[in-house]
Structures are given as structure tokens and as C-alpha cells.
Design a protein with these regions (language model features):
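Active-site gating/metal-coordination segments in enzymes
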Residues: 3-95, 136
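Histidine/acidic-residue-rich catalytic or RNA/ligand-binding cores of hydrolases
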Residues: 91-98, 123-132, 148-155, 175-188
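Mid-to-C-terminal alpha-helical segments outside catalytic/metal-binding sites
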Residues: 39, 160-167, 179-219
Length: 219
């Protein structure tokens, strides 16, 4: 794998700071993670945190991470976490369960979190968590590849009344903005000729147009 350092992200953002916002990433199982956090936030000016628990090998609800959550909450740094499936055989799925973030959000209610990929295939857990906690959201990145699954996931969102907790995302460069938009907007077409309930077009468009930056405290 090609390593990408926080300094690389900061340099990239500096080329177009009026439209780009950089997130730092760290491994809280390593002894120098506090230094990385401080450097990325205070020295490089990165404004959020991206975590990959299944690759670093930690449970998000481990009490040893309380220092990280406390810092992110105090400095209003939104945290984006991978939740759900992975194709890496040695990455424990148990570290990606959305329900693990329930304990974190309960302990740190002002912490803003985004559960990436709607936690698929654990969408039910994800919906339960974002419904319960005011500042916990989910994104729909990298889901349009499986339109039937995505339809059912968003129908779950619709029935639980949590459309307002969803954020648009793409997982670029693995997919593009245009492909992601087309995939979302075409979901109801697979239902033609059936009596299955439709996803609300208005709710879908509202999600696409949502001011995510304000919700996450980034503007």
C-alpha cells in the first residue's frame, strides 16, 4: 500500500483551501498517536479525524480511546469511521459494528461522528445508532453498486424516519460523484411493474443537497 501522510493531505488542501477540508488519520494503538493528533490538528490545520478500526485493530468503544474522543469533542473535530464490510481477510469485522459507537456517543454526546457506508451490511444497527444520538450521522458512500441492497437500506431509513441523519458521500476515487448521484436517483426504477413502496424522491434529493458542513460544525 502507498502511505499517505497527514502532511500530504495538508499540502493538497493548501492548493485550494476555499473548497477543500482535510481530515487527519491516526492509529490509536500506536504509542505516538497523541503527537500525531496534535500535529495534524494544531500544526497542519486539519479539521476532522478519519479512523479505520478494523485495520488498526481496535474497538471504538475501548475505554483507552476516551482521550481521543474527549479531544475530538472539545475541539469540535468530526470523526469519520469506517463501519461495515471489508474485503481484507485479516481485518476483524467485529470492530466495524455500528453498535460499538452507541457507547461512545452516550459518553460523549457532543461528539460529531459519521458512520461511513451506512454500516452495510449492518444497516439496522447503524439506523438504530443515528436515530438515538443527535450528533451521529451516516453517509451513503460506495453503496450504489448494489442497488437492491441500497433500496432496502434506505427503505429502513425511511421507515425509521432518519432521512435527516444521512449525508451524501462517494468514496472517491473508487467511484465518482456523477455515478453516485445516478445510482441514488435511479433506485426507484428497479421497482417498475411492482407494488413495492417507493423511496421518497424529495427526501432523497434533500439528502443530496444537505448542508453537511454546517451539521458537522465545519463552517
Amino acid at each position: 500500500a502507498l502511505p499517505i501522510y497527514d502532511s500530504d493531505i495538508a499540502t493538497y488542501v493548501s492548493r485550494s483551501p476555499e473548497r477543500l477540508i482535510g481530515f487527519l488519520s491516526l492509529d490509536p494503538t500506536q504509542p505516538n498517536w497523541q503527537q500525531e493528533l496534535h500535529q495534524g490538528h494544531c500544526e497542519l490545520g486539519l479539521r476532522g479525524i478519519k479512523l479505520m478500526p478494523m485495520y488498526a485493530g481496535f474497538r471504538p468503544d475501548d475505554e483507552r480511546l476516551d482521550e481521543l474522543w474527549r479531544y475530538a469533542s472539545a475541539h469540535q473535530l468530526p470523526v469519520l469511521l469506517h463501519t461495515g464490510t471489508t474485503f481484507i481477510s485479516q481485518a476483524p469485522l467485529e470492530f466495524t459494528y455500528p453498535r460499538l459507537l452507541d457507547k461512545v456517543a452516550t459518553k460523549f454526546p457532543e461528539l460529531r461522528m459519521i458512520l461511513a457506508h451506512l454500516g452495510h451490511p449492518f444497516e439496522g444497527e447503524c439506523v438504530a445508532v443515528i436515530r438515538k444520538h443527535q450528533h451521529v450521522y451516516a453517509d451513503v458512500s460506495a453503496l450504489h453498486y448494489r442497488p437492491w441492497q441500497l433500496y432496502n437500506s434506505l427503505m429502513l431509513v425511511q421507515e425509521y424516519g432518519v432521512w435527516h441523519k444521512l449525508l451524501f458521500g462517494t468514496d472517491y476515487p473508487f467511484t465518482t460523484v456523477n455515478d453516485s448521484l445516478a445510482g441514488l436517483r435511479n433506485l426507484n426504477t428497479q421497482l417498475e411493474g411492482t407494488r413495492l413502496p417507493r423511496l421518497s424522491v424529495d427526501a432523497l434529493e434533500s439528502m443530496i443537497q444537505r448542508d453537511s458542513l454546517s451539521l458537522l460544525g465545519l463552517i
